[in-house]
Amino acid sequence: MGKTLADQITELANKSKVPDFDIEDEQVFEHDSNASGSEASDEDEALQAAHYVQVGRSKLRNKHNVLVEDSKYSGSKGSREALFNSSGEEDGSESDRRGSDSDGGSDSDSDAPEATLSSEQSADESARSDSDSGDSDSDSGSDAGEENSAVAEDADAKRERLSQLVRLETQQAMGKLNAAVQNDALKGYAIMEQSRFFEGAIDVRIKLQKAIAAANQLPLTKQSWESRLDAQDAELLESTCKLLHKVAGKCAELRTTFQNKERINQTEIDYQPSKKRSIDALAEQCHDLDSQLRDYRGAVLHMWSSKVAATSGKTALSSSKFKAINQPANVQVDNQLADMPRLVKRTQLNRRGVVPLGFEEDYKQKRLPLLDSNSAQDGGQEEDADVPANYDPRKKDNNAIDASENPYIFDDEDFYRVLLNDLVDKKILNAQQGSNVQVAIKARSQNKLKKNVDTKASKGRKLNYSVQEPIANYEAPINGGFKWSDEQIDEFFAGLLGQRVNFDERETSEAKDNEEEAIEHDDLRIFG
């Protein structure tokens, strides 16, 4: 069926500018693509370069040529025959064969003109020159290939060396980082152990506080002991002495082992535990251990104090360098222990007013020589600023109490309070840090939960109110226990209004009688 006029018109109207080709038709694409493509490419390049400005040769090209023409880029001169003997020999054999052939031809054809010979020689020379030029090109190409391969190998070797250096530096950095992390972890663990040891020592001191206070009440002289000692007390005293002897031996053994292990002692001490050693021998051994520990302690404190001061930068300021707080820890300890009599005197203050058993009797009998000598010395000495004559921390009026010095008691309550305050502050700080973390975690969890919103309290369906907190330090007036009567209330308000009310009962009864008589004598009668 043929196309209608409308179809033909629409086909002509919608005909595309670029003709459509069937990709399966092989004859459509059979044309000279090279010629047309080259011409089209030339035209395109000409159009693209039409707006270019004509410029001269670049200076970079001249510099590049100068660099390339440098003497270091030129090769060494040599003869081809020396390098390529094999190729020369092959060329010689071929020329011999050709010469023999030409001789045979001359014998057979003697009448040939000399022009043919000259033409053949020229042809042979041209062929040889072509072969020589080809050999030279191949030689130069092989030399360039070898140079390129050598350069590539050098670049690969340098790249491998750089990668090895980078890998080695990375390993060293990781090793240093791991070592630093391990050192920091060890320092933190050591600090935690020191804190635990400090807390344990203060805990022991807290438990011994009651024992020290009770020990100050024990009798001071032998006569007082014998007068108050019975069989049961003697048995308890003997068991306590054995226990104290055992504890002192264990402490001496532990300290000796520790100081030998840590190389604190200059000469290793051979400790042999024995039950026959007296308390005096154990005390002497502890004194020797203390003397050897003192030097080691000073060196360690000085080393770590210097490191801490160097990292904090306090030593850089010349104005604060010589302050007591900025000096090394061992120097501060030595300065505190320099005035030992003053420190001992502070431990002999009777702060709690302790009176040992039999103290009055011993004092009257003059069995306390230390107390008598101290009282005589105090009479001629001036008042000490650290140990006032009238001192009692429990009393507000210290001038009324004479808390004198007693050399037979031991009371380090001031130092004990300092240690206890440090421990309490540390515990409070740790608790606050933990509570802050818990509060942050709780607030974060509350933010994730759904808000508590009453959806039914809109449009006046609920009355919103808040309970007011009670007023602090306020008390409403309280009645004295009696109330006004009705007559008093009426009289009070009547007086406020300027009226007077009479509360006489007889007058009210007479008024009632008069009213009744007036009703009886009334002329109006309704019922008979």
UniProtKB/Swiss-Prot annotation:
Subcellular location field: Nucleus, Nucleolus
UniProt biased composition (Acidic residues): 132-146
Main localization of the protein described in the UniProt heading: nucleus
Cysteine disulfide partners in this protein: none
Chain segments annotated as transmembrane: none
Coiled-coil ranges per UniProt: none
Keywords: Nucleus
UniProt-annotated stretches for the region Disordered: 14-158, 372-401
GO terms under biological process: maturation of SSU-rRNA from tricistronic rRNA transcript (SSU-rRNA, 5.8S rRNA, LSU-rRNA)
Family matches, as Pfam families: AATF-Che1 (PF13339), TRAUB (PF08164)
This protein's GO CC annotations: nucleolus; small-subunit processome
Family statement drawn from the similarity comment of this UniProt entry: Belongs to the AATF family.
Name of this protein: Protein BFR2
Organism: Eremothecium gossypii (strain ATCC 10895 / CBS 109.51 / FGSC 9923 / NRRL Y-1056)
Gene (name only): BFR2
